[in-house]
């Protein structure tokens, strides 16, 4: 039988294509597939139709109902919001809170959309995002599925396993009410769905060595399917702008603490955070570190301005922390589009991202492509990006700061180390050559190269393997 190469690619995500790293990655990948001449569809969950769309890509909506006014009433929408592992700007619904009846409706709606797409377009391959429910459902059809692991799905599986152990303990102690058994059924379903997705996918894409180890630990039966496929960035969007030209972007942003709502311009150094306000992103550490480095740099005659770029469920809590810390030069400026983020990365002196166990982090790569210096935690997939050769790093005397080739690493949950690392970069900015940072990121994290040389051949291999099985 002659083998068939991929022509029609259907990317499936149970989340919106904006507001989280997985959506950014999907968008970058889809753009490259279109440029390479493929027919591309994105099936995406959302509670509205007002979102950015790529030319040449067909978008199929899995409709949900939003929480915030104005609510767009979508035809056939589920009567609840799209469901997240952590949080999203436009949804507070998560897999811990959802009820069994909602889960049944959730699965039915996804299957309805999948079957419509198969009937009308018959894709050659499904590219499922997250080893979770929607991907498990995809594997029920006679079309090969490859799955990208994003990290939150592995966290979700571990959470389900832990919650199930707690529930079984409650039952053993005699708590036999219906609510306990409903929760038990829910977490059993989550674990079974993740295992089904792992077992039935033709390929499993992981985005870091740490994630590869974790996936194989949780799903040893699917270890032979795992392929390391780095997250890439769209170099048409992320590149270094001339700082003098890019500075005007500050005039377009609003501060949450100044009387006139404008950002001050009399700063000497600029630090930024970019990301969603989820617990593991540790925006709280950025604020606590800012309290330290604002004061110490001020004593040295330097004013550091810090911009917090993003939004999410923890926004009110974080702004309350900002107020309690009496931060003078730290400003929340809201979620911003990619072109604004590019300009801010281009004019910034340091990028702060102290996440707990960040699976990979596109933002580090976007930062490097713009010639900025990232500070990240020595955990998860971050060392793969900032210290790719796995060198033995020596801390700066009297600190826990580990300068690496392409940024600075610190321990998790340590605001003093984050403050020390920030000041190290601000006071020694010339140690990191901007061109070296950009060249490294362009060589290793160009999404077009990754798509053309790695992903498309793996799609074709998955299709060929499926044909051999028939």
Where are these regions (language model features)?
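A conserved catalytic-core segment of Leloir-type glycosyltransferases
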Residues: 42-113
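Membrane-proximal helix-turn-helix segments that form the acceptor-binding/catalytic region
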Residues: 169-204
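Conserved donor-binding/catalytic core segment of Leloir-type glycosyltransferases
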Residues: 205, 254-281, 287-290
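Carbohydrate-associated surface elements
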Residues: 210, 232
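Nucleotide-activated donor-binding/catalytic signature segment of Leloir-type glycosyltransferases, i.e.
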Residues: 297, 303, 316-336
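Short alpha-helical donor nucleotide-sugar binding micro-motif in glycosyltransferases
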Residues: 335-336, 343-348, 455
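Aromatic "clamp/platform" in nucleotide-sugar-dependent glycosyltransferases that forms part
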Residues: 356
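Short hydrophobic beta-strand element within catalytic cores of glycosyltransferases
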Residues: 373-376, 383-387, 392-394, 399
């Amino acid at each position: 039988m002659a083998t068939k190469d991929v022509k029609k690619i259907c990317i499936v995500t149970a989340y919106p294509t904006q507001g989280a790293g997985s959506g950014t990655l999907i968008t970058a990948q889809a753009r490259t597939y279109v440029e390479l001449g493929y027919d591309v569809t994105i099936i995406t969950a959302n509670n509205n139709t007002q979102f950015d769309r790529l030319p040449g890509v067909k978008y199929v909506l899995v409709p949900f109902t939003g929480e915030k006014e104005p609510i767009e009433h979508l035809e056939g929408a589920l009567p609840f919001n799209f469901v997240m592992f952590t949080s999203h700007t436009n949804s507070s619904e998560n897999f811990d809170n959802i009820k069994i009846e909602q889960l049944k409706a959730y699965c039915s709606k996804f299957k309805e959309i999948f079957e419509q797409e198969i009937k009308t377009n018959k894709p050659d391959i499904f590219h499922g995002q997250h080893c979770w429910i929607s991907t498990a459902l995809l594997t029920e059809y006679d079309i090969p599925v490859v799955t990208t692991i994003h990290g939150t799905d592995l966290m979700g599986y571990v959470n389900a396993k832990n919650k199930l152990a707690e529930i079984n303990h409650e039952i053993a102690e005699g708590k036999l009410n219906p609510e306990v058994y409903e929760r038990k059924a829910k977490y059993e379903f989550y674990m079974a769905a993740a295992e089904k997705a792992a077992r039935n996918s033709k390929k499993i894409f992981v985005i870091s060595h740490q994630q590869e180890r974790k996936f194989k630990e949780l799903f040893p039966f699917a270890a032979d399917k795992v392929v390391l496929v780095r997250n890439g960035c769209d170099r048409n969007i992320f590149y270094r702008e001339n700082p003098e030209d890019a500075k005007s972007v500050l005039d377009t942003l609003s501060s949450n603490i100044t009387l006139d709502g404008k950002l001050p311009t009399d700063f000497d150094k600029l630090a930024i955070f970019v990301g969603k306000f989820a617990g593991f992103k540790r925006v709280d550490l950025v604020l606590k570190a800012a309290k330290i480095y604002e004061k110490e740099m001020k004593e040295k005659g330097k004013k550091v301005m810090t911009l917090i770029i993003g939004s999410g469920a923890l926004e009110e809590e974080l702004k309350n922390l900002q107020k309690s810390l009496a931060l003078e030069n730290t400003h929340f400026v809201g979620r911003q589009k990619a072109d604004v983020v590019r300009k801010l990365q281009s004019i910034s002196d340091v990028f702060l991202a102290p996440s707990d166990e960040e699976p990979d982090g596109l933002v580090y790569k976007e930062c490097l492509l713009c010639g900025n210096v990232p500070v990240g935690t020595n955990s998860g997939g971050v060392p793969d990006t900032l210290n790719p050769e796995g060198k033995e790093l020596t801390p700066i005397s009297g600190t826990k700061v580990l300068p690496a080739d392409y940024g600075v690493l610190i321990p998790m949950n340590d605001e003093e180390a984050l403050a020390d690392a920030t000041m190290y970069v601000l006071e020694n900015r010339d140690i990191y050559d901007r061109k070296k940072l950009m060249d490294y990121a362009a060589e290793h994290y160009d999404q077009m190269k990754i798509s053309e040389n790695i992903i498309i051949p793996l799609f074709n291999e998955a299709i060929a393997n499926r044909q051999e099985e028939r």
